[in-house]
Amino acid sequence: MKQQVLDCFAKLFGGEGDIRTYFAPGRVNLIGEHTDYNGGHVFPCALTIGTYMAARKRDDRKLRFYSMNFEQLGVVESSLDEFLMGKEGNWPASPKGMMWAFCQKGFPVEQGFDIVLYGNIPNGSGLSSSASVETVTGVMLRDMFGYDTISMIDIALYGQFSENNYNGVNCGIMDQFAIAMGKKDCAIFLDTSDLKYEYAPVKLEGARIVISCSNKKRGLGDSKYNERRSECETALAEIQKVKDIKSLGELTEEEFEAVKDAIKDPVRQKRAKHAVYENQRTVQAVAALKANDIAKFGELMNASHVSLRDDYEVTGIELDTLVEEAWNCPGVIGSRMTGAGFGGCTVSIVKTEDIDNFIAKVGAAYKEKIGYAADFYVVDIGDGAGVLK
């Protein structure tokens, strides 16, 4: 892939000078959904698919972007003096947002770039293609300008900062953290309240991770994501009148049951219940994985989906069909929606010998019920973002 991106760069912008290449993965969250902005735990991993970038510094302040995924847009031209969202169409907002964030954080971007990007993350799948683009841009800027004091965790935080403040998307830290800090064959047990984390080896003896992409189009900003977030913030404020906590992630299930009546609205109560119970499920799931109890891990994945469907109400017929059909397939250890919901994808752990049957059976049932096809990807857990040698 690296060579294809370099060839494309040379064709568009010429092959001379110091052209450098970078990679940032996509991510999937195994369990711990809609907990990252509620001060809870998440358990994501980086994937071996992601975003490749070739870049070269310019002597002026011009920016030239080309995406091999959006060839019809051609070369999109901009400048470091035009940090205005929406001027240049959708996708350059992610790299430009990261450049803006570096400037805001005291790391000036004084020269422009020629940039070619290629991503093999399915677009709109919910596997974090925009966070991957942000992170690969952050790695590039750190490398090109020699900003060695910036850590990979800083890059993740700058990515979140640019999403929140440049792109206007109220995301948590999970996506950028998983992409920046990923480790081969491990998932990251991350406490989003303080960014304490540990790597947990994912040993799926005789099984693999299968991503089922619903192909229902959704955008994070225009989905009900922000609505759920504000429902949880209101619920937290109501609980804080009777209990001294900073986030819903601090509550055990028992503590929540004791104070839940402080939440006046039954819908908000359900939202908060999901945040608390999902956090506990995530803690239990990591313990199960450490104990090599993959069956228990799968049960907790299934319970996570039920909660996202019934209490948090972020699934919809597409994701429910993918998951419920998966539950009926032989060899499926666990299956749940992953990501923000309202479309996007599901993650399943499937015994290797049953994968072909799983894809055929779930795929046929989905097409019959929904009217268009789902896509399936058997994925591996890879390392986080970095410079390609």
Task: Show the residue positions of the predicted features.
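Gly/Ser-rich oxyanion-binding loop with an adjacent helix/lid
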Residues: 1-22, 28-32, 38-41, 80, ...
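Glycine-rich phosphate-binding loop
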Residues: 342
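Short Gly/aromatic-enriched secondary-structure transition segments
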Residues: 39-46, 228-229
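A short glycine-rich, hydrophobically flanked beta-strand micro-motif that places a catalytic Asp/Glu
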Residues: 113-117, 319, 335
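Short, charge-rich binding segments
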Residues: 44-46, 54-57, 89, 106
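C-terminal nucleotide
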Residues: 1-27, 52-88, 186-334, 349-389
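FabD-like malonyl-/acyl-CoA
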Residues: 132, 345-349
